[in-house]
């Protein structure tokens, strides 16, 4: 049986927390983007997860350039907000322009040495670009890959991920 791990941000608001909490083993939510943006739902998601004892991950959507500084902004933004059910930090490295590979490597090393779990999120089509980072990621770091196929909200075996992926995002369509 598949498990669903929702990716929540100001783009995908939760309308029924009870339903989400019961259906999902953990929550993933956007915290920051770049060096200045803080997702307006960050506080609400953390509060709801802590109140309901639901594990949650926080991620930074990395704009191109200054990846380490963006990872530090993520941590500084979240450090005083997280609670007992916080799992770890995620770096979302899918921007169109592409992220600096060395910058992603440094940022991943930084978040992976904070005492929490870590994760890197990549797009299927960008695998070659980030392969060296993925292959040498720390032991406490999972790999989340987006490969949508038809992107109709339904999983299809016709669109597998790359070998070694821990979490497969098969749609950007919520339900």
Give the residues covered by each predicted segment.
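Substrate-binding cleft of extracellular glycoside hydrolase catalytic domains
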Residues: 1-22, 28-117, 140
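Functionally critical loop-and-helix segments that line ligand-binding/catalytic clefts
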Residues: 1-18, 25, 134-175
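Flexible, glycine-rich phosphate/dinucleotide-binding loops
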Residues: 35-36, 65, 127, 152, ...
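Short beta-alpha junction loops
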Residues: 64, 94-97, 123-127, 150
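Glycine-rich, charge-decorated loop segments at or immediately adjacent to ligand/cofactor-binding or catalytic sites
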Residues: 67-69, 126-138
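Short, aromatic/basic amphipathic alpha-helical patches
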Residues: 73-76, 106, 131-136, 156-159
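Short, well-ordered coil↔helix boundary/capping segments
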Residues: 101-102, 121, 157-161
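Aromatic-lined carbohydrate-recognition surfaces of secreted/lumenal glycan-active proteins
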Residues: 115-129, 143
